[in-house]
């Protein structure tokens, strides 16, 4: 193989390795807020933005028989 072919293969492997590393931090994490209180959509979304810089939505929590706030946000690497 010529030097240019080997260099091209090396560069492709290097670029693919960088792209793979960058996309690993894109995973989403979750946290449940307002377990003791009944969830309000506006309050839930505001709390999530303040605490995690994420989005919040209410869901029926079968363990507390109330609506809880589910906060979804990008995981930190």
Swiss-Prot record:
InterPro entries found in the cross-reference section: DEFL
Disulfide-linked positions: 29-75, 39-58, 44-69, 48-71
Signal in keyword set: yes
Keyword Disulfide bond: yes
Primary location: secreted
Pfam families per UniProt: SLR1-BP (PF07333)
Domain of life: Eukaryota
Compartments reported by the entry: Secreted
Gene Ontology terms: biological process: defense response to fungus; killing of cells of another organism
GO cellular component: extracellular region
Signal peptide: 1-25
UniProt keyword terms in alphabetical order: Antimicrobial, Disulfide bond, Fungicide, Plant defense, Secreted, Signal
Recorded family membership: Belongs to the DEFL family.
Protein name: Putative defensin-like protein 118
Lineage: Eukaryota, Viridiplantae, Streptophyta, Embryophyta, Tracheophyta
Encoding gene, per UniProt annotation: LCR52
């Amino acid at each position: 193989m010529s030097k240019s072919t080997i260099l091209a293969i090396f560069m492709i492997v290097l670029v693919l390795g960088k792209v793979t590393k960058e996309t690993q931090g894109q995973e989403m994490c979750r946290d449940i807020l307002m377990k003791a209180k009944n969830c309000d959509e506006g309050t839930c979304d505001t709390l999530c933005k303040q605490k995690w810089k994420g989005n919040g939505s209410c869901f029926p929590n079968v363990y507390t028989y109330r609506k809880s706030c589910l906060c979804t946000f990008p995981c930190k690497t």
